[in-house]
Amino acid sequence: MIKTLAKNIKGFVKESVLTPFFMILEVIVETIIPFLMSSMIDDGINKGDMQHILITGGYMGALALTGLFAGMMGGIYGAKASAGFARNLRRSMFANIQSFSFANIDRYSTAGLVTRMTTDVTNLQNAYQMLLRMCFRAPVSLICAMAMTFIINARLACIYLIATILLSVVLAFIMNATYKYFSQVFEKYDELNASVQENVTSIRVVKAFVREKHEVGKFRKAADNVYRLFVKAENAMVTVSPIMMVTSYASIILVSWFGANMIVSSELTTGELTSMLTYCMNILMNLLMVAMVFVMLTMSLASGKRVAGVLNEKSTLANPENPVYEVKDGSIEFDNVSFSYNTKAEKPILNDINLKIKSGETIGIIGGTGSSKTSLVNLIARLYDVTEGSVKVGGKDVRDYDIETLRDKVSVVLQSNVLFSGTILDNLRWGNENATEEECVNACKLACADAFIESFPDKYNTKIEQGGTNVSGGQKQRLCIARALLKNPKILILDDSTSAVDTATDASIRKAFSENIPDTTKLIISQRVSSVSHADKIIVMDDGEISAVGTHEELIKNSPIYNEIYVAQTSGNGDFDAKGEL
């Protein structure tokens, strides 16, 4: 974990070195001042030597200014180093997340990743700043002060040594006891963020069903879980301060008592006792700093483990050593393919799939909910890797291609249509960042999106709100189809991507595809028979297997599942899911 996180110090090594340097300089200054103060009292004030007082006072003043400067510089460099460390962590995490396959993404919740990028990184930032400043300052100051007390009087110094050892043992015990609580706290933060995210993104549904009270209750429960665990952790940590105070006062009383007796017996001077008490406060303050560092490190250990987990996550998909950089054509072949999202699953999602599709063919895919239609097409763009068998595109196994090359030629319009903040043109150019406005317009005409775009006052410069909330479901689908077309793909996959458009528009899109992109292999997943009836071949999926393959006419005669869907839809009962699901 530490090695993974330490890589993100790059670019801020100078600041990370200068911070402890200035902190140690400040410690050295603070250690010398009480020693000079002892000399001022014994050799200056007690003897009435004004010259000694002025010279020693001048040295103390100069050292105080040096300590002030060192402390300020340490704070400045520490803040810069920790902020840079946090920035690098977020950049590294975000870049690694972008490389994740769908299988990697499935392991983390969206809220969990958000918590890691925000709360956990902030904890690490604070811990790193404290590490640079306190973790160097406190131990060095503690050792220096302890050494000076032994130089002044070894017997009195033993009181500090015993107190330090006892406090160290107690702090180690408390840190070990609270670590598990902070680990659980950050897991509950994931649930809290998930509750907020789900509510904000689905606020229209919440309002439509008048479920505000239910959502408030759900959020309150998540917030209470965080509260309870945090209180448990803090209940353990809160004992640190009282223990520190008791130890501090006990040490001061003991040193004062024994020191006074030593002064009476001429074993100790007044100046030496004053220095001992000053060093006592120095030692105890540094122990308090160490306690604060322990608290922060306890919290950051849990955060560090979570962040390092994301940084160390390797994509389940990787380019081969000598990848293929050209997709010959849009032909597709499934050869004895089986697939599971979970390798430990008893039954595969797809089982023994064998299928050949010629380049330029239009293929319809139909079947009931959960029949694995989407899982089938996800393998073509290598969004997932097969468990058994192979998938070939252009005569080559998809695992032999450079992933970027393959996905550039296999354009997928997913079930969940996503638009980003920006103009319509900005969204379209996700398909091809170098596309001209004319190319964007042509793609929109093919997707039957040009007409409604032209009706907007700003036309193609119309701003899309976050999530595309200012366009209808059908308009959003057509924009996503146009975006996919701008890639000039050899394979176009429409995963139920016209479900929100009317049948006339659906037919117009199909006609435009047939006339304008005849060489592109088109796979159309749909619940509507009318959307796939024109296809060269229709694949009927049932429970992860291919139930039947054929033309519309052939399947009406030979496939009970397809015939049932067709009859249900043409008889006016609406869209029909296989196996009698309406």
Task: Identify the residue ranges that each predicted region occupies.
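Transmembrane helices of ABC transporter permease
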Residues: 11, 15-28, 63, 69, ...
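Juxtamembrane helix-loop junctions of ABC transporter transmembrane domains
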Residues: 21-22, 29-42, 63-110, 114, ...
